[in-house]
Amino acid sequence: PAAISERIEVRRLMAWFNEKFFEEASGPLVMERIYKRFMNEQDGGGAPATDVIRAAKNNVRYHLSYIGWLARTRNFLAGDRPTYADLAAAAHLSAIDYLGDVPWSEDDAAKAWYARVKSRPSFRPLLSEWLAGVPASRTYVDLDF
């Protein structure tokens, strides 16, 4: 974006998703549902902590609501055009969408925004990645979920 206020908004949203969303939602879900299965017990591996998963899933709802509000008030999360903020949010969402942990039915605006972002050619290589032994959710590769 050209205007300083628009650049600030992009950076604010990038920090929101890369720090807050990661700490409260995507980080714990990926750690508990994926990383732990490949880690030694002495390194923190083992059975997933269901209380952590439950809390992170609740936090996803809160963040999804915020994404929906942004998507209803703007074309993209930080303004009229896609920015790094959209990519940051979509990257975190794609990780938990892979696991099937995004309640898309709870916010149509967030769902429509994510469908637009993941339909972009630059995002498609991300959707082609698969993890052996962990099948992707139905919505992960479906562009019109």
Give short role names for the model-derived ranges:
Residues 130-145:
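Acidic/histidine-enriched, glycine/proline-rich intrinsically disordered or flexible terminal extensions
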Residues 16-17, 143:
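Intrinsically disordered, low-complexity segments enriched in polar/charged small residues
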Residues 17-118:
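GST-like fold's C-terminal all-alpha helical module
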Residues 44, 126-127:
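Short, structured secondary-structure boundary patches
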Residues 2, 26-30, 128-130:
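Short coil/turn segments at secondary-structure boundaries
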Residues 3-13, 87:
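Alpha-helical scaffolds flanking conserved acidic
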